[in-house]
Every structure is written in C-alpha cells, then in structure tokens.
C-alpha cells in the first residue's frame, strides 16, 4: 500500500456492496423471519454519539441510518478486492429524535436482545453462500 506510481489507495465505491450478495443477505433474512430494510447508511467516526446538528445534516444528505462502523470496513474490504455485503443493527434513535441523553448501555441492551436474530440471519446467509 505504498505511495507512488500505480498507487491504488483511492478505491471505486460506486458499487461498494455486491448486488448478488445483498440479494442473498436480504433473502436470508426473509427466510429467517427477520425484517430487514435497505437504505442509505452514513458514517460518522466515534466513539461518540452524533450531535443533533449532524443528524439533521445526515437527513439532508439522504441518510436513512447513521453509524460509527461499516463504512471503513467496507472501504478496506473493497481495497483488498473483496465482494461486500453489510448488515447493520440499529441500536438507538439518533440524537435529537427522542428526548433525553443517549447512552451506550442502551445500545448494548438492544444488541443483546437482537443477537439471536442476527446470528440466525448470518447462519442462513452463510449456508446459502456455501
């Protein structure tokens, strides 16, 4: 990953998520009885919750969901020439959408509650990809 002639640090992200893998992932969720939605995911670096102003800006940009991961991992995987599909679990409402402060404990609780469903979707997906 050096700098110089032929440097390929700038990865084409036009089709960051492989259409066939996306379809398999959505079909796997449906087969597992888990509701999934497609949408525009915007990344803000953490480890901090977004501000209400950032959430308003994300909405203007067309975001359906906001998170602190997924995008950097996708860029790295695409740089390595890998096909990518992503599954993100929304664990809290964005800042300014509900009253009160956001808390990491809430995200951990929601993630723990949904863990079995996520495992089922991933297991079904991997079986379909084998």
Which residue ranges define each predicted feature?
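Glycine-rich phosphate- or other oxyanion-binding loops that anchor nucleotides, phosphorylated ligands
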Residues: 1-93, 98, 105-130
């Amino acid at each position: 990953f050096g700098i110089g002639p032929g440097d390929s640090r700038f990865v084409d992200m036009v089709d960051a998520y492989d259409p066939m893998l996306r379809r398999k992932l959505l079909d796997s969720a449906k087969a597992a009885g888990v509701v999934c939605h497609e949408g525009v995911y915007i990344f803000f670096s953490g480890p901090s919750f977004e501000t209400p102003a950032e959430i308003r800006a994300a909405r203007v940009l067309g975001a359906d969901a906001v998170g602190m991961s997924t995008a950097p991992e996708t860029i790295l995987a695409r740089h390595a020439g890998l096909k990518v599909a992503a599954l993100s679990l929304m664990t809290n409402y964005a800042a300014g959408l509900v009253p009160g402060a956001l808390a990491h404990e809430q995200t951990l609780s929601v993630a723990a509650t949904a863990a079995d469903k996520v495992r089922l979707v991933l297991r079904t997906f991997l079986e379909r990809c084998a």
